[in-house]
Amino acid sequence: MKPENKLPVLDLISAEMKTVVNTLQPDLPSWPATGTIAEQRQYYTLERRFWNAGAPEMATRAYMVPTKYGQVETRLFCPQPDSPATLFYLHGGGFILGNLDTHDRIMRLLASYSQCTVIGIDYPLSPEARFPQAIEEIVAACCYFHQQAEDYQINMSRIGFAGDSAGAMLALASALWLRDKQIDCGKIVGVLLWYGLYGLRDSVTRRLLGGVWDGLTQQDLQMYEEAYLSNDADRESPYYCLFNNDLTREVPPCFIAGAEFDPLLDDSRLLYQTLAAHQQPCEFKLYPGTLHAFLHYSRMMKTADEALRDGAQFFTAQL
């Protein structure tokens, strides 16, 4: 798509989204576009500190979980001692960025609004770790907490997965992995998916949208994919292109959230239409005027807070 033919996204977004885009952090250096991936990860962590401020206080615990690849860091957010379920959260960041700190506020608000224990899993990033290592470590962490539930005083009888962007793909892929391989980690009662990618290679929204403002040009998306996957054949794996998995049976109830000006929006629409066509429990909600990654900005955006509340309400309705 010739850039001039794309939608003028920054003219079309909502007033509160524009406020976020125009919010400057004077002490923050420029984005290291030509820097190393380590420098970009460091910048991302610094940039998110402002947006994570003011999150609810609650009991938190950290555990290192053993996997066949080594140990993975996890963080538990416990809003109350008698949690009705446990929700595993997987952060976004194109598979190459992000950690438990960059998504701290999101996890705290989810825990507060759902009154469920939320466990963030700091899965290994790409390109150091290639598909399907992240999924395997997520599943290993779920199994570990299922086995240690009594010792850690968490309720693993009912669980869920949640994630944003790349984390949304990992959330649904992990749920399908557990189903397909018949691994019992507790009953999966819900999956919360904010503006994920689920396997489309091209779409209308991928053509019309995406730019320097969201880091989701076609070239960006190709770079994330190449960093994450081990080889070309992985593109068709049912745990990367989730539309190649069986979405006609035993898919946990899915809350699918879309951002209006997100190039990945058609992934969410197709996922919803596929699940709904096969009578799989699902709900789709579009958040007008928003860009990809808007969930981070609940400190300033009522719509972001609403999207988190909607996801939490969907999850608790399944209990």
Swiss-Prot record:
NCBIfam families: PRK10162.1. It comes from the Bacteria. HAMAP family: Acetyl_esterase. Displays esterase activity towards short chain fatty esters (acyl chain length of up to 8 carbons). Able to hydrolyze triacetylglycerol (triacetin) and tributyrylglycerol (tributyrin), but not trioleylglycerol (triolein) or cholesterol oleate. Negatively regulates MalT activity by antagonizing maltotriose binding. Inhibits MelA galactosidase activity. It is found in: Cytoplasm. One of its GO terms (cellular component) is cytoplasm. Belongs to the 'GDXG' lipolytic enzyme family. A motif (Involved in the stabilization of the negatively charged intermediate by the formation of the oxyanion hole) lies at residues 91-93. Pfam families: Abhydrolase_3. SUPFAM superfamilies: alpha/beta-Hydrolases. GO terms for molecular function: carboxylic ester hydrolase activity. Homodimer. Interacts with MalT and MelA. This is Acetyl esterase. It is an enzyme of class 3 (hydrolase). Gene3D superfamilies: alpha/beta hydrolase. It comes from Shigella boydii serotype 4 (strain Sb227). The active site is at 165, 262, 292. Keywords: Cytoplasm, Hydrolase, Serine esterase. Its EC number is 3.1.1.-. Its main location: cytoplasm.
